Amino acid sequence: MKKILLTLSALVLLAACGPKQTYEYPFQNPKLKIEDRVENLISLLTPEEKVGLMMNKAISVDRLGIPSYNWWSEACHGVRQDGYTVYPQPIGMAAAFNPQQMYDVFSQVSDEARANWNRSDHDIFNVPMGVTYYPGNPELTFWCPNVNIFRDPRWGRGQETCGDDPYLTGILGLQTVLGMQGNDPHYYKTHACAKHYAVHSGPEPLRHTYDARVSQRDLWETYLPAFKKLVVDGDVREVMCAFNRYEGVPCCSNDRLLTDILRNKWGYEAIVLTDCDAINNYFTRGQHETQPDALHATVDAALHGTDLECGKTMMALTEALEKGMISEADLDAHLRRTLRGRFELGMFDPADMLPWADLGEEVISSEEHDALATQAARESMVLLKNNGVLPLSKGLKTVLVVGPNADDVALLNGNYGGTPTENHKHSLLEGIRAALPGADVRYSKGCELADDYNTIYHLPEFNDGKGMFVEFWDNNDMKGKPAASGYYNTLNFSTFGAYGFAEGVPTDKISVRIKGRFTPSFSGPMSYTVSSDNGYILKVNGRVVENAKPGMGGMRGFGFGRRGAEYKTFEVKAGKPVDVEIEYRRGAGPFAMLRADFCERKYADFAAEKQMAADADVIIVIGGISAQMEGEGGDKADIELPAVQQRLVRAMHETGKPVVFVNCSGSAIAFASVEDQYDALLQAWYAGQGGAKALADVLFGDYNPSGKLPVTFYASTKDLPDFLDYSMENRTSRYFKGQPLYAFGYGLSYTTFGYGEGKLSKGSMKKGGKVTVTVPVTNTGSVAGAETVQVYVKSLDNPDAPIKGLQGFSKVQLAPGATQKVSITLGDEAFSFYDASVDGLAVRPGRYQILYGSSSRDEDLKALDFQVL
């Protein structure tokens, strides 16, 4: 032992006497405080370099060994690239009412992000200088979560959120941030970003022009709480200011939002960044027009709180410096925050100093991650109606699966998602067939999503059934060999909420050629629709039929699905082959988009489907909408189930067979007109790569559904206020005075639960106190299941308060006959409302009811009286 100690001592001495690591500049020394390293680096930068570091594509500073970096990456429900795990859309994961699962999901997402970073060389002494990174390259800064309130179900981007309730949104958004950023005391695993700050939820086409004006009560009680929770409790490292104006001032220059509230009230010290090209809205004609030009717009944003721009307009700050409109000290204040962000992510430190250095590419799309994605999909599904049809027996002999979403793999990815690996791409139809290997599972698409235009390019007569052949070039001129190519059954390419066009092909300069040959079985007009960001050329049999310049055909139809598409025609003859070709070149705008469809317009009478159902044991209709009908840039015009699908449901009901409707959407759909036409309704959202297995598990009883609605399902579009009205009056479960079709928090199970008499730990409390409600819950059915116990607070003395507001919940798993006491504690936050005297929320004394139960419906709740002194 003595000899060993002497040897160790000698080694320590040798280490101490060995050569010390030397650094050319102090900022390179990881032993120094981050503050000192940041100040040193700032002192070494020229004014031009400082400006170049204030945009999302931050420049490289070769002389200092600083590589370029792209701040923009997305991870709404998985890293937004090809070949990564795709989890359910956040709106679906919110339906699980499972904060721990949300944390686990985003911990895995950040694992995959770090693994991607690790397999690329980002050491500042080794990375080739001058490299420019584009979305799709390894990044550590992710612009999620979206914690806007889903106030109106027509909003296209509501699927990215956690619903229409500020409490639920805050709780789940917080877990997203914690999972993304990690818990290391020295480094952040990745950066999360709270967006879009603050009063922002459509309409999408007006987001660059509208001025959100709301009462201070709505601001503080609805629109701000989730942001505050992420900032104060989550230490979120980035906040994205929204496109729109608030009270007349663009959000990215808004002193009220960025300085008074975010920095001063909440103590936020990290990065504020813009949505992409938001500063351009300041001076672009027909948009905000609050500034005359790019020069004044960038100065306005920089002097009023914006640290980092997604775009390149801030290059004008160099001219602003020369003209004395802004000082170098002003730039330094912004750089202290952005550069600190890169240091705290460990970008300038040796890789082996970071706790995630051993994460390799084996974690990317791993089986462990797929298992959680599948479990998250199971928990997301909400059973809204069941006349005893579900669960289905695995002994069924014949099943008819019909509907436009049944065999669409891309549907499951939703908005702002990547794409899974090939072995994890399975349609909902495939999931059902896998669960019934011995049954006759018949399939018909039945109809398209929203009208009687029937897509034909996936049929056998089109390119021998392969679909359309698409070639992608990494230049604007289709020069050289294509960078990628393949056959596609869906022509829907976009960087709006998507990772790109084709794997490995950067989209900053891209051109595309789509080709197909088909032999029509009919004579007459062939319908087509094409939309792009920069025009297109359509050729039929080598002849140019349409040469749409930018702005012609342009963005028309984006985000609205077929309801907003414009159709044109050309004539075809039965039996005569037709060659079609589309050429596209990306424009100069911030987003790229190309969508096309070739269709035969034919009224769907569903006679064939009725015949297929004649000897079926059950009919499973898989419909709803898709991210092509709701997403960034476009909203739904109404919330009704598309008319053609209503006809489909009625036709299937007429067969007399049991009908199970599986609805895929990222928002509430109004089913009132067909609610009596199906025997069971399952809300499946956009379920990610595990959706096929999850749906089958739920339908056939391998998993007992436990999801609860994170939004209100209204009976009709007529129940909704004006989309442009940001007042919360008569919106969501907190203020809606009507009768919803399916209420917030509602969801059935294959078992039943009974609620005993709840008890409060005390009958009153003062500010700073806490009260605990304890509720006995019993599984009164015959199968195990999970129940989400929900607690709402209703003020009896405050006429301006919500009708009731969610203030706590707990999900419990119970065996048949088992009883568990569930305790939920409420503090000041549950009894706080807007108070003008404090310019914010304050505890309000008075009489309250603490409500507990299985949903927000009055009939599902029991009340306990309580008082705040």
Walk through the language-model features, giving the residues of each.
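Glycoside hydrolase catalytic-domain context in secreted enzymes
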Residues: A16-M526, S531-Y834, G840-D858, Q867-L869
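Bacterial Sec-dependent N-terminal signal peptides
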Residues: M1-E24
